[in-house]
Amino acid sequence: MAFAGKRLKGLIAATFTPMTSNSDINLAAIEQYVDYLVQKQHIRNIFVNGTTGEGMSLSVHERKSLAEEWVKQARGKMNDVIVHVGCLSLSDSKDLAAHAASCGADAISTVCPSFLKPSSLDALVLYLKEVASAAPNLPFYYYHIPRLTGITYQIYELLGKVKKNIPSFRGVKFSDVNLMDFSLCVSEYKEFDCLYGVDEQLLGALAFGAHGAVGSTYNYLGKKNGDMMAAFEEGNLQKARKIQCSLQEFLIFVFDMGWGLAEFKDIMSQVSGIPLGPSRLPLYSSMKFDHHDNIKTKMLKLDLI
């Protein structure tokens, strides 16, 4: 990915981290994973070591090993590998950012520490500037996910400040349902990539001008979401709405079961056939073997697979 000129767009899969049965990282599964995304889901961009990848539950050493393997296996097959480098420790985030640059990542992204939060928008900007400075030649994206971080500053206000302070800043992974804030980001800051991160509202974000989207469901529903985006771009709103509603119905089915990230990882294993292993504690999947047929039946009924 060139530092200037090229824009991130389209679907970006937020990858799960493959693990062994005892929750050690499983680098050997990544080659098969990349091939599945490219060949079956038509995905050409990935966001690694983020929320879906359980990045905050991994050690710095594990995250470096994963970044290296994702970059290695994606080379020649994918367009862009974005490495999430956010940590509770600023020094660890800078270490991961510098490592991402050295191993050939195409861009980096970070959340802000959420245990001891920034006391102001200016403090957040200073933090982001420090992280970005560790990899000044890599495009840098802020990861906004207030539901998990509790950091609720308006992003269109943030963009005005980072524009003046962080030369490598290229955009935001916007994982929030506030479409007014998102719309202002798109309309007021056209030089930045605004990537939407709430999968079940993607069509709404496209209507407001989203450049692309980062999400976990694009791992196993990437082709179907790609069909929706294509229908939208062609002006076939009826088809786009139909697909979005089917995707939403599937997610409602999953949420009504009380399931979350650990179970989504199980669904990815089931749909793809890739042994991704369990999630790392404190995440724990409550999915039972007899749920598998229910999931497949639901996806077939909704024409998702």
UniProtKB/Swiss-Prot annotation:
Sorted alphabetically, which keywords does the UniProt record give? Carbohydrate metabolism, Cytoplasm, Lyase, Schiff base
What reactions does this protein catalyze? Answer: aceneuramate = aldehydo-N-acetyl-D-mannosamine + pyruvate
What GO molecular functions are on record for this protein? Answer: N-acetylneuraminate lyase activity
Which terms in the GO cellular component ontology are assigned?
A: cytoplasm
Q: Does the keyword Cell inner membrane apply?
A: no
Q: What highest taxon heads this organism's lineage?
A: Eukaryota
Single GO BP term: N-acetylneuraminate catabolic process
Where does this chain mainly localize? cytoplasm
Which residues does the record give as aceneuramate binding sites?
T51, T52, S175, G197, D199, E200, S216
Which residues act catalytically here? Y143, K173
> Does the UniProt entry include the keyword Ribonucleoprotein?
no
Gene3D superfamilies recorded: Aldolase class I
Q: In which pathway does it act?
A: Amino-sugar metabolism; N-acetylneuraminate degradation
Give compartment(s): Cytoplasm
What is any Pfam family matched here? DHDPS
Q: What is its EC number?
A: 4.1.3.3
PANTHER family listed in its UniProt record:
DIHYDRODIPICOLINATE SYNTHASE (PTHR12128), N-ACETYLNEURAMINATE LYASE (PTHR12128:SF21)
Under the subunit heading, UniProt states: Homotetramer.
For this chain, the family text in UniProt reads: Belongs to the DapA family. NanA subfamily.
Q: What does this protein do?
A: Catalyzes the cleavage of N-acetylneuraminic acid (sialic acid) to form pyruvate and N-acetylmannosamine via a Schiff base intermediate. It prevents sialic acids from being recycled and returning to the cell surface. Involved in the N-glycolylneuraminic acid (Neu5Gc) degradation pathway.
The protein here is known as: N-acetylneuraminate lyase A
Species of origin: Xenopus laevis (African clawed frog)
Q: What is the lineage of its organism?
A: Eukaryota, Metazoa, Chordata, Craniata, Vertebrata
